[in-house]
Amino acid sequence: MSNLPVEPEFEQAYKELASTLENSTLFEQHPEYRRALQVVSVPERVIQFRVVWENDKGEVQINRGYRVQFNSALGPYKGGLRFHPSVNLSILKFLGFEQIFKNALTGLNMGGGKGGSDFDPKGKSDSEIRRFCTAFMTELCKHIGADTDVPAGDIGVTGREVGFLFGQYRRIRNQWEGVLTGKGGSWGGSLIRPEATGYGVVYYVEHMIKHVTGGKESFAGKRVAISGSGNVAQYAALKVIELGGSVVSLSDSKGSLIVKDESASFTPEEIALIADLKVARKQLSELATSSAFAGKFTYIPDARPWTNIPGKFEVALPSATQNEVSGEEAEHLIKSGVRYIAEGSNMGCTQAAIDIFEAHRNANPGDAIWYAPGKAANAGGVAVSGLEMAQNSARLSWTSEEVDARLKGIMEDCFKNGLETAQKFATPAKGVLPSLVTGSNIAGFTKVAEAMKDQGDWW
């Protein structure tokens, strides 16, 4: 009987990686990598601390703060901070574990980590959020630094919270350094950072489409279902529209907003209204009944979009949270004509859904759904965070065109690396598309494993 705590989210992430390595020829060709897997699955350091702060009534409030410093073989620990009541050590270990390999796939010098708190920003005043961030950073600042650990935003941590956190770090440490990414543009932030994850997942899928069609097709004319309505979903939607596609759904934790007419699409103006709503920390349901939305969209409470979209659609981009596509929903996506699914969120698909997608890919040469895991498809966000770190180190700021061009190059490399690695270690049958989940897992893992071996972390 194990004396380790039950950590379902982390165990799911570990088993997903381990099973893809086992089902490839990697361990046959390199049996020593089994030892590396054992070592890399244990965090280098886990920091847990209390956060005591004062609400607007002058009452003491207590939350738990965490930072999982998982692996630093490739560079400083790098990964977001999440403020949400669901946060626990299992979720942060899963996110940090995924982050190791995602960061490796970018080709930049970044290790993997993740942190956060079970604090819920919803319903809190600006003053309460500022006081919480100040208390949180008062403890976290002892464990981070530009060359040690560089956190960023995540769910519940927007540019505003990053500003509060950065200000407290600067006051306590008396240092201005690139200790956080996602900063404001006038104080060390990078252009394209808010857009990066959403843009990146669309750039990645564009390469998938071009590979399958021999360069004959793109997003133009394709219907795209997106879940979520935060940064990732908003900017993915805007990029899809820019490239000629139609966005047919967005969602939040309370329900989904879906176009009524098969020929309709969200417009940039409607997405801007949704962005304003999210800044005000309100729900999509408040827009659904407004005159601008009621005639064009259906709002379905307590439902995800995947089984509620009218007609056929070609692309699905889960961009809300983990495990948001079930096995049953995966079957429905296939029946709805989806050819490409890429995770804008981390571990957006359950293992049951991934198994269904991969089985369909193997069984249907030339006409299969093709699944891209989050560690590759949504690496654009952390890639531009890495570019922000580079700009901070050089005390330079690049133009949005420079950053976007680098982002496109990184996403192309992520796609090609996963594709070529899959062809090498999990050679598909004739006409079958390579497994991007296998290729991405192996490519990220082997890069980290080799760096750890060179540095004496395993032998």
Curated annotation (Swiss-Prot):
Give the reactions, separated by semicolons, that this protein catalyses. Answer: L-glutamate + NADP(+) + H2O = 2-oxoglutarate + NH4(+) + NADPH + H(+)
Q: Its Gene Ontology biological processes?
A: cellular response to farnesol; glutamate biosynthetic process
Q: What is this protein called?
A: NADP-specific glutamate dehydrogenase
Q: Which UniProt keywords apply?
A: NADP, Oxidoreductase
- Which InterPro entries does the record match to this protein? Aminoacid_DH-like_N_sf, Glu/Leu/Phe/Val/Trp_DH, Glu/Leu/Phe/Val/Trp_DH_C, Glu/Leu/Phe/Val/Trp_DH_dimer, Glu/Leu/Phe/Val_DH_AS, Glu_DH, Glu_Leu_Phe_Val_DH, NAD(P)-bd_dom_sf
Q: GO molecular-function annotation terms?
A: glutamate dehydrogenase (NADP+) activity
Organism expressing this protein natively: Emericella nidulans (strain FGSC A4 / ATCC 38163 / CBS 112.46 / NRRL 194 / M139)
Q: Which Pfam families match?
A: ELFV_dehydrog (PF00208), ELFV_dehydrog_N (PF02812)
Q: Which PROSITE patterns match?
A: GLFV_DEHYDROGENASE
Question: Which PANTHER family does the entry link to?
Answer: NADP-SPECIFIC GLUTAMATE DEHYDROGENASE 1-RELATED
First-level EC class: oxidoreductase
What is the annotated quaternary arrangement, including any partners? Homohexamer.
Residues in the active site?
114
Per the UniProt record, which EC number(s) apply here? Answer: 1.4.1.4
Question: What family does this belong to?
Answer: Belongs to the Glu/Leu/Phe/Val dehydrogenases family.
Q: Which CDD domains match?
A: NAD_bind_2_Glu_DH (cd05313)
Q: Which SMART domains match?
A: ELFV_dehydrog
Q: Name one GO cellular component term.
A: extracellular region
